[in-house]
Amino acid sequence: VAEAGDVIREHVPLAPLTSIKVGGEADALAACTSFQGVTDALRWAVERGAPVAVVGKGSNLIVSDAGFRGVVIRLTGRLSSISVRSAHTMWCGGGASLPRAVQRAAAAGLAGLEFGASIPGTVGGAVRIRRISPRCSPGRWCVMPPGAAR
């Protein structure tokens, strides 16, 4: 099933998406490269009454051999990119590698992500488990209303 340039595949093994390489299959996997792709995947799941899980690098993920009865979303492409915007800011997609973000920040002279150098996860995963918080500008925490992250 193709939705807005992103692909939703059904009956996808999840073991290859985890660091320990075990687990069953998901009913569906959406590899999303854009915010619109995520929106479309969520709509697709809601239309089917399916639960949703977002998966990053799979470094903190154990999947049951029974699999996941729902839609798994992976953030790829632009949603896993990293861009240094100025001397004080860097944009990271939720699917961006946390160690890679640390490297890019250090190369740009930015500080604050050093703790993540050895964490094999994603920026989105670090936000989810509250290891980091987004900031809008130097010294201010970022609070983004729905749809503002476009």
List each model region and its residues.
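Anion-binding (especially nucleotide phosphate/pyrophosphate-binding) glycine-rich loop
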Residues: V1-V123
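FAD-binding subdomain of flavoenzyme oxidoreductases
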Residues: A111-S118, T122-R150
